[in-house]
């Protein structure tokens, strides 16, 4: 969402508009700033170097098109960054995932990254409360030839997960799950996903560094939504660190991604 802890406290609507359209002095915007600086790197130039050198040249045309469509959406800061999409695509291939799940879809950039990495008979159970956003990216997904892999469910994810947990045949049947949704429910999702993801499978939680606010003092000024969800993110990070059912790795990709490998 934002770049650093400083931006978490100081970014305003005019500043966001200025970031999206240049610096106010006629300087042209950098490409990644179209959807905000989704990296915790302090150097904007270094992040741009990563995108220009390793990410954009390898980005599939369908993902590029979806990224550009999403950049025009008023909620574009909700999207997965291009480097994180590349990371997820590689991760799916590395673990040989076939059956996956995504909680929180938005326009489907990370969903498309996953779908492209899955084998032809791979599947994704995708859940989001807003079908309209998903349908914004659906033409790109279909154009990429992977729409048949996606089972989209509109509505809250917890009832869907509870139904899956109630079906013993679904236990341990998923290879991978990616969560980028309501932070106040991350721990609720975690308990259910540990039943549904197979031993050795992975769960990825997005935004676990939460705009850098996780290192700010409690009395630091923050935007309202940052402050509201900050304690939930801190609680998640502490809980995952103490959970012996998983091995964890927290990475400064995008806004922070924590990978959990189920071991119990």
Swiss-Prot record:
UniProt-listed GO biological process terms: lignin biosynthetic process; methylation
Residues annotated as binding substrate: 38, 180, 211
Basic and acidic residues bias locations: 28-37
Enzyme class: transferase
Enzyme Commission code(s) on record: 2.1.1.104
Low complexity compositional bias, start-end: 1-20
Names of required cofactors: a divalent metal cation
Protein's UniProt keywords contain Metal-binding: yes
Annotated residues for binding of S-adenosyl-L-methionine: 80, 102, 104-105, 110, 128, 157, 182
Region described as Disordered: spans on this chain: 1-37
Cofactor binding, per record: Binds 1 divalent metal cation per subunit.
Pathway as given in its UniProt record: Aromatic compound metabolism; phenylpropanoid biosynthesis
Single GO MF descriptor: S-adenosylmethionine-dependent methyltransferase activity
The reaction(s) this protein catalyses: (E)-caffeoyl-CoA + S-adenosyl-L-methionine = (E)-feruloyl-CoA + S-adenosyl-L-homocysteine + H(+)
InterPro entries per record: Cation-dep_OMT (IPR050362), SAM-dependent_MTases_sf (IPR029063), SAM_O-MeTrfase (IPR002935)
PANTHER family: CAFFEOYL-COA O-METHYLTRANSFERASE 1 (PTHR10509:SF81), O-METHYLTRANSFERASE-RELATED (PTHR10509)
Role of this protein: Methylates caffeoyl-CoA to feruloyl-CoA and 5-hydroxyferuloyl-CoA to sinapoyl-CoA. Plays a role in the synthesis of feruloylated polysaccharides. Involved in the reinforcement of the plant cell wall. Also involved in the responding to wounding or pathogen challenge by the increased formation of cell wall-bound ferulic acid polymers.
Protein name: Caffeoyl-CoA O-methyltransferase 2
Taxonomic placement: Eukaryota, Viridiplantae, Streptophyta, Embryophyta, Tracheophyta
Gene: CCOAOMT2
